[in-house]
Amino acid sequence: AYSCTTSELKAVYDVKDSSKHNALSAYRNFANETITGTDNKEYQTDFFGMLDTFIAQKPLGVVCDFNGSSRYQSIDREFFKERKINFYSINDFEIAHEIIPEAENLVHVAAEMERLHKEGHNEVVLGYMPDCDGDRGNIVYWDEKQKKAVILKAQEVFSLSVLAELTYSIWQHSDEKDFKPAVVVNCPTSMRINEIASALGAQVFRAEVGEANVVNLAREKREQGYTVRILGEGSNGGTITYPAAVRDPLNTIFALLKLLMMRECGLYEMWCTKSGQKYNPDFTLSDIIASLPVYTTTGVSEPRAVLKVKTTDHTKLKAAFQKAFEADWKKKSGELKNKYGIIDWEAVITKGTVETCGVKDFSTSEKGGLKIIFKDKDSKPIAFIWMRGSGTEPVFRIMCDVKGNKVDMEKALLEWETELIKKADK
């Protein structure tokens, strides 16, 4: 084993402060590039000047529940202050509750936002909670109509980020002759992303679950001439904004701020025009959220989204699932048509960066993702069920996505999927 000398150890400690300073400075510069979409300093100055002007007219505040996250030691506090955005935080130094930034753990930052409003800090409109290593964070916002803090679901956070960064990319590059906007997501990301992208004239490409798969597919698509400004795994809300290759809650927050601050001929107005919705110039974040396509989606952290299985051979399990599914389809097709308007289905698999549609043999997905897309009489997708086995534990991750506010339909389809997997696992 190697042991260092006292002088070598001292040399490390002697440069720790300067090294930390340089690291934070590099991160701050990179955040500026990621948020603005360019390394051009003059453009960055103009962009943040526009933000400063908006904030001078309408002050903004952000609250963070660090929950002992490493982000407390990062640039967040100073970065917001540089932009004249009031910043508040709780649980700076300690892990005070569960660490996954999902709805059940965002109640703490929501409560702090409501406390701040009671004390007169009405400028606080956004809140976030990062995970321990600081790359993931989900959002709480202040609903002016309900006068309370509202927790956004992971798929809603990602949808807002996609809306913001797609429209921003179009705003930046639409006059370029070869501009081809695209979004890259993982297999279980809600179909609401397809609706947003379609309205904005963008393509959606899907990879297998796993941040590396999504990042690699985005690189492949850029090599093919697409502009992929935004990518990520909607199932966990994580936003990856190019040129970054990892999630960052700062990019998520500033995506939402872009929507709010760019008013005249801005991003939200572009979205309303292209999606055929009425534009109100005096809009709030609540209005933007209300304009999003409505879907009912299983939350990734819900107990019903994890199913224990005995079969370790995923290929065998999926072959048995197909047999059970096709047998049940013959029995249930009439009921599915009458209750939910489901006329047909299509199997889709994802393995690494490759998505294959119209699959006839479910088992070819092996350890990858398997999705059954349900279609209506016009052959349009209206729901899907999805599954993928864990590589580290004997469980299957499952979920359902349904177009519209249809809680009963989502529940019924997920229960059906659960029954079929259990039958296949015998």
Predicted regions and their residues:
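Short Gly/Thr/Asp-enriched flexible loops that form oxyanion-binding sites at enzyme active sites
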Residues: A1, I75-R77, D135-E156, I193
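Phosphate/diphosphate-binding loops
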Residues: N105-M129, V162, M191, G210-A212, ...
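Core alpha/beta catalytic barrel or barrel-like domain that forms the active/cofactor pocket
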Residues: Y2-C4, S89, M129-R136, L231-G232
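Gly/Ser/Thr-enriched, mixed-charge loops and adjacent short helices
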Residues: A1-G120
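Short, acidic/turn-prone active-site loops that include or flank metal/cofactor-
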Residues: I90-I95, A154-F158, E208-N213
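Phosphate-binding and adjacent anionic-ligand microenvironments
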Residues: L126, P130-C132, W142, K147-V150, ...
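Structural signal for hydrophobic packing residues in well-ordered secondary-structure cores
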Residues: A1, A23, Y27-E42, L51-D52, ...
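Ser/Thr/Gly-rich flexible loops in soluble cytosolic domains mediating phosphotransfer, phosphorylation
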Residues: A1-A23, L152-K177, C265, E269
